[in-house]
């Protein structure tokens, strides 16, 4: 036997290296074997529910880091609420309809030398369904690999018949409330995908366009002006001029009549200088009027034989141009509003492909709108009304799918009216704004953001001219044109869809008469022949009804309505948050959520957006293969996710280093608890050593701060709090001090059991606090905890969070140890200086002599018998005058002095402490070690080194 064999050295099978890429799939397998999600539901049955409703990702392609960030954040929150003892089910979902899937299917058809037109709608929809299902299955496995716990066996899919049926019922409710209508209004239109687009589906990018100033000749010169008078407009969309049906001026602005040679130009007073700079036109101001005095003046179109009028509009601003705005109600939202006010139709001589129809002048018929710009500019030049022409770069809406510029185009569409009166006698807009005030928005600026959007948004265009989606289930009477929007008919169609294996396909396979209730007649003219609506619903309506199709459906008995939380990227203020809010308010008079939490976007290490063109995209799979999913989860909480969050290989390496430190701390716990039975060996609080009570007090503070951070969704605070606690408070101080006591004292001594009791508390609490974040590693640790305490649950995720034990909080003790820590910090500096001066090589070779102010001296003096272990030296002496080989002034302890000299006595071969009892009367070890060996019934004669 050797001296080291008499020590309680750490023992554990918990590996130093995580080997997460290989270990994590084994843990997922364990969760599946024990059916963890079902077990959670059983354990939490009857408890208060917490519902985080999953915003559905799009079933197209593999997941990217944005998906990972989103799902991990949701998982952290759901796991925390579950570990607080709540019933927190999570039903993941997928958005399965829409144009991107249609486009992918068309690409596949092209490879087979087929076209969409060669298939029936049902055949095409079948291919779309198969494509969506393929990616649902791919993404499901990718999300599970991230450690997300949820109802993966029964997710919600927007293409599932029961979901589609509820969507049709929701549409029926909106029609019953009288706020759905069909109208011809300008909407975003993609001329390449040939469909209307939602505001949330456009993205703004730089585009080059002509910038022109055009003179429109007034039919008669007003105010007794002799010369010809021209109203001057400025536009960057010359292609909209064929649809010009008016000019708008602001009633409150001042407008000037500027005489230049034999012509007079009308321009806003505040824009005269910039107008003259651009056009080179200068002259004499002969008249100044308010905008309202120009109302109803008539002018001639510059290249069409048409007379139109000047109208008043509050939308006209003085930022650029002339203060007179060309009005095309068929191509602009504000133009349309003013047109409606004055009874001017929405005219748009442009077809689905963006080509001018025969309603446009002959010289541009058949041309696409952007191609026509040049021809129109040339025509204006020929007619002598082009005052200035240049090319400008400006921000312009583009289709988020095909990346091409979109146009505003008036087409017959279905809308939900924002200003129609609901059952409560209020507008949908007004009700939605009230709900926004009731909902909790995190971060708080989200409230103003969505409020501003709702205040200013146009009516919601819910129709799309595509195949893969849920039909707008209305009919038209062939005899009188009456729209059949009877709620009973909606209910009948919903029932048919729900019972059919392929759901809404039935709409495209059957004739109108087969779909309507038997013997149905037009309530207006008694007609028997009907036509189906061909348009489908906007995908934002699809996902916007998820609260009803999922939470209210009863298909998932673990759920409830409304949701406690919606959590998505900040772009969803104009997307899913908004569509869900409007649908919820329209159908049920309230928002379907009580709180909304948003996260930012992912940037590379340099702060650039992730893009394939920059080559800075990192697939989650790459990170998982290299480091494991827990490192990705730790990255999610490493920064404030409510802002944009950076990622890169250097950052991940740094996070992996932090992970290793945390893991090694748990290894220390487990290694020193190998002979500890949590049910038998715990030391009662009142018998614990003082330093152990101090650490328990500090642990309670950490538990309290962690709960506060989780409850306020400040997950990065938890990471930094625990990281600091583990690295600074534990590894650098407490665990370092504890080694001597754990190794040297007899296994069942009070000194050792006291330390082990607190180690177990630390292990138990920290594992639970980290479980929502490091879901795999904490599960691995919990397997070893079960060996120490077989009464714990089978999975860490079935456990509940630690709660603060007020009895363990000791502010006075914390204050005492704050002082001792300051003394310790100064001692460590002095020891470092002594090491540099070759006085000592190891702290145990040192004796420290302390000269301290009274308040510090008294706390050390009370603990003089054992304080050397706290300072990790062999001897401590208090003196009025610190004398030694190295003397330093106190940095932390003002007025203090620390002297370091060689410790007296010999080095104990067992504990390495220098003590005068070593060698005395032939004793090979110090008195303390002799006592422990006797307790352990180990004879000196049995130790080889002692012979």
UniProtKB/Swiss-Prot annotation:
Q: Where is this motif: 'HIGH' region?
A: 57-67
Tell me if Ribosomal protein is a UniProt keyword of this record: no
Q: Which domain of life is it from?
A: Bacteria
Q: Which UniProt keywords apply?
A: Aminoacyl-tRNA synthetase, ATP-binding, Cytoplasm, Ligase, Metal-binding, Nucleotide-binding, Protein biosynthesis, Zinc
Q: Which Pfam families match?
A: Anticodon_1, tRNA-synt_1, zf-FPG_IleRS
Output the Gene Ontology cellular-component terms: cytosol
Q: Motif range for 'KMSKS' region?
A: 609-613
Query: Which reaction does this enzyme catalyse, per its entry?
Result: tRNA(Ile) + L-isoleucine + ATP = L-isoleucyl-tRNA(Ile) + AMP + diphosphate
PANTHER family reported for this sequence: ISOLEUCINE--TRNA LIGASE, MITOCHONDRIAL, SOLEUCYL-TRNA SYNTHETASE
Name listed for the protein in its UniProt record: Isoleucine--tRNA ligase
